[in-house]
Each structure stands twice: as C-alpha cells, then as structure tokens.
C-alpha cells in the first residue's frame, strides 16, 4: 500500500514539473516603402524596399531572422547592391 502511495505522489510531482514549460515566443515585423516619380514622361521607381524581421524560440533557443530587399529604376546596379548590403546588415 505504501508503494502505491509513493508512486502516485512521484507521478504527480513529475507531471507538475514537466507541465511547467516556458512560453513559446514568436514576434514578426514587416515594413515596406515605395516612392515613384514621373521622369521624362515615364513613371520611375525611385526606391522600393521591404524589410521583414522575426524572432522565435521554437527550438528552445531565440532565433532572429532579418530579410531586406531594395530596388530602384534610377540607381546603378552597384548602388542598388550597396544599399541591399546595408539593409541586410541592420
């Protein structure tokens, strides 16, 4: 009879400890901006960028991801790539 009571108490303690888990955290953020202008009778994109950030702990470790994209009709490909690199380092 004593063994049964000890097993029940031990089981209750184990269930109580294992059910006390940390909360799952997930945060997502997204922003986008665009500017266009008529130049020489044509609508040109001065800049178009979007940024997405997310943080979660699905694996038990906080994981942060950052994605950014940039485009422009009036900038050179080298300038566009430079801006993309700066956005991805933020």
From Swiss-Prot:
Protein name per UniProt: Accessory gland-specific peptide 26Ab
According to the record, the signal peptide region is 1-21
Task: Tell me the domain of life.
Answer: Eukaryota
What keywords appear on the UniProt entry? Behavior, Cytoplasm, Secreted, Signal
One GO cellular component this record assigns the protein to is: extracellular space
Q: Name the encoding gene, please.
A: Acp26Ab
Record's subcellular location: Secreted, Extracellular space; Cytoplasm
Effect of altering residue 64 to H? In strain: AF1, AF2, AF3, AF5, AF6, AF7, AF8, AF9, AF10, Au4, Au7, Au8, La3, La10, La13, La14, La15, La28, La31, La32, La36, La37, La54, La58, La60, La62, La105, La106, La116, La118, La120, La125, Ma3, Ma6, Ma11, Ma18, Ma20, Ma21, Ma23, Ma24, Ma31, Ma35, Ma37, Ma43, Ma50, Ma53, Ma56, Ma57, Ma60, Ma74, Mo29b, Mo40b, Mo52b, NC-003, NC-004, NC-006, NC-008, NC-009, Ny2, Ny3, Ny4, Ny5, TW1, TW2, TW5, TW6, TW7, TW8, TW10 and TW11
Q: Does the keyword Cytoplasm apply?
A: yes
GO biological process entries: mating behavior; sexual reproduction
This protein's major location comes to secreted
For the keyword Signal, the answer is yes
Q: What does this protein do?
A: This protein is transferred from male to female during mating and may affect egglaying and behavior after mating.
Q: In which tissues is it expressed?
A: Main cells and secondary cells of the accessory glands of 1 day old virgin males (at protein level). In 5 day old virgin males, only detected in the secondary cells (at protein level). Reappears in the main cells after mating (at protein level). First detected in adult males 3-4 hr after eclosion, levels increase reaching a peak at day 3-5 which is maintained until at least day 10 of adulthood (at protein level). In unmated male adults, levels are maintained for the first 6 days of adulthood and then gradually decrease for at least the next 8 days. No expression in females.
Instruction: Please spell out the taxonomic lineage of the organism that makes this protein.
Output: Eukaryota, Metazoa, Ecdysozoa, Arthropoda, Hexapoda
> Pfam families, per this entry?
Acp26Ab (PF05777)
What does its record list under induction? Up-regulated in response to mating.
């Amino acid at each position: 009879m004593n063994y049964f009571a000890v097993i029940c108490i031990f089981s209750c303690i184990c269930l109580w400890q294992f059910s006390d888990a940390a909360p799952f955290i997930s945060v997502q953020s997204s922003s986008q901006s665009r500017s266009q202008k008529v130049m020489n009778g044509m609508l040109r994109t001065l800049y178009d960028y979007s940024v997405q950030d997310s943080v979660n702990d699905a694996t038990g470790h906080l994981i942060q991801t950052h994605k950014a994209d940039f485009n422009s009709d009036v900038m050179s490909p080298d300038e566009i790539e430079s801006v993309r690199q700066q956005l991805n380092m933020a």
